[in-house]
UniProtKB/Swiss-Prot annotation:
Protein name according to UniProt: Small ribosomal subunit protein uS19c
Annotated source species: Chlorokybus atmophyticus (Soil alga)
The keyword Chloroplast appears for this protein: yes
Function: Protein S19 forms a complex with S13 that binds strongly to the 16S ribosomal RNA.
Record GO cellular component, one term: mitochondrial small ribosomal subunit
Gene3D superfamilies listed in its UniProt record: 30s Ribosomal Protein S19, Chain A
């Protein structure tokens, strides 16, 4: 179910404060966060946010097409190594 419009999008408070601080000083630096559930809002455009995927922080440069999506959508947590080409045991 979608989030109520009267509540607005969820953005972690600490992340929002960091971005507002950098926008006020007109600085660009990588912002490290564990908040994968935060929604990308228009004030984040142009910033690089390093999102934790369970093992490392993946840097994500936020563009205008990402607005409305969650930060976790852009840092995959699982690595797919492919299927085994000749696996005769699974055929039986």
């Amino acid at each position: 179910m979608a989030r109520s419009l009267k509540k607005g999008p969820f953005v972690a408070d600490h992340l929002l404060k960091k971005i507002e601080y950098l926008n006020a000083r007109r600085e660009k630096q990588v912002i490290t966060t564990w908040s994968r559930g935060s929604t990308i809002v228009p004030i984040m455009i142009g910033h690089t946010i390093a999102v934790y995927n369970g093992r490392e922080h993946l840097p994500i440069f936020v563009t205008d097409q990402m607005v409305g999506h969650k930060l976790g959508e852009f840092s995959p947590t699982r690595t797919f190594r492919g299927h085994v080409k000749s696996d005769k045991k699974s055929r039986r």
